Swiss-Prot record:
Substrate binds at residues 116-117. Belongs to the type-B carboxylesterase/lipase family. Glycans are attached at residues 57, 106, 241, 256, 341, 455, 481, 486. This is Cholinesterase. One of its GO terms (biological process) is choline metabolic process. Disulfide bonds join 65-92, 252-263, 400-519. Its EC number is 3.1.1.8. Detected in blood plasma (at protein level). Present in most cells except erythrocytes. The keyword Secreted applies. Keywords: Disulfide bond, Glycoprotein, Hydrolase, Phosphoprotein, Secreted, Serine esterase. It catalyses: an acylcholine + H2O = a carboxylate + choline + H(+). The lineage of its organism: Eukaryota, Metazoa, Chordata, Craniata, Vertebrata. Esterase with broad substrate specificity. Contributes to the inactivation of the neurotransmitter acetylcholine. Can degrade neurotoxic organophosphate esters.
Amino acid sequence: EEDIIITTKNGKVRGMNLPVLGGTVTAFLGIPYAQPPLGRLRFKKPQSLTKWSNIWNATKYANSCYQNTDQSFPGFLGSEMWNPNTELSEDCLYLNVWIPAPKPKNATVMIWIYGGGFQTGTSSLPVYDGKFLARVERVIVVSMNYRVGALGFLALSENPEAPGNMGLFDQQLALQWVQKNIAAFGGNPRSVTLFGESAGAASVSLHLLSPRSQPLFTRAILQSGSSNAPWAVTSLYEARNRTLTLAKRMGCSRDNETEMIKCLRDKDPQEILLNEVFVVPYDTLLSVNFGPTVDGDFLTDMPDTLLQLGQFKRTQILVGVNKDEGTAFLVYGAPGFSKDNNSIITRKEFQEGLKIFFPRVSEFGRESILFHYMDWLDDQRAENYREALDDVVGDYNIICPALEFTRKFSELGNDAFFYYFEHRSTKLPWPEWMGVMHGYEIEFVFGLPLERRVNYTRAEEILSRSIMKRWANFAKYGNPNGTQNNSTRWPVFKSTEQKYLTLNTESPKVYTKLRAQQCRFWTLFFPKVLELTGNIDEAEREWKAGFHRWNNYMMDWKNQFNDYTSKKESCSDF
């Protein structure tokens, strides 16, 4: 009983004991870590918490942060499983802690950061339940809610009323909370590993780049996301435009920043949600309407630049991707794609799809993608275009940036480990053609297949146990290979050989240079195409318009000149 009441720096909290796999885990759900960002604190950095006097009941998940929910496939488990399962509120800055029982001494801590494109997400989803990891690996698991969408990332640079990156400062404050308080829970503040998926992994990699976050953790795990991905960070200019667009849509005057923010602060959060989806003129199906920005405070430069300069925390990282990262985005509106059929698309639909995912790229740029991704040996195969678009979207947005991040990191002599996850869960509600989808390694990391009554296979339970073991080993020792030598050794990823490990229900294998050909295209060739043809369409349109103007001038000039010569002739008659 005494283990479930713990004294934190802000006051006492009461948790609860949960039976897990024949043992016990003590869970503390919904501990506040910041002042609720309400009223005049909306859009501001999180403010630290004052003390409370009685015992805080941390026995149920807190509110989820305000967000738009996914209504694309009502009642369908595949999309609904990611929607918030607690009430939406602006009062949402709470965290959860799972500790093995009896209370450990100096246990390693793993802090989970959820994904959701910086627009959605919550720490209370069943698939993020920390109890299995705590029970099986005897680590302490922590997860926090952070603000998303405009409420978390609206940005007017250097204006403390809405500085941008508020959601990342929320995460950072939760990391500080762990530093100050985790010892009371039996955790070791000097052994803290961040792990996250998608936008959560991009967040983790931003903490690696942010000087203020670096002292607050030890190591990092990035699952299917990184800060150098094309969707992860918005330029200041773009972020400012979106803020102004939002203000305009909501009838707030844009003449004076202070007035504008005051006006936005008075709006109903639901109204902000309805309008924030319209701030990007074209929907790429991967739209991050409001996300991280270079604010000069949390983030001092674009991630690419910081990576290039080697300005990141020197430590070990574990990074990886799934086999079919692109499919999850295609069913949300690429032409010819549906979750209810095989999505065999035509060349024309493939080209239309490219337009959706690369709205600002010239026709020539899109042609270069088609050329590179088409299997010309077998261009009559029905699935070709479907698989090609899956690869294009997955490589460009997830796989190649993650590999590039790992490569840059390892060049400076830091140990990096890379995985390629290729097991399709037998419980996956999405259709077969979608393969090993974005987000579907998470249940294996959190040990959901260990619960007997959930109908995973025995092989999946074994896979999940081995992933948990490797993740926890990495968190404890900076190396996923334990002392026991019965499993395949996971070699270090070096920028030269680029070795990686496959994770599936067979035995893991080591390969080198994942998707080397494709990633060369994205990192080296494609930027050149953009530079040269930048927007060839734009240039061409301007040239044509210019030519028409010139043509008209010429006609005009000719008429004027004829007029002049005829007048001159009539004058010379006198």
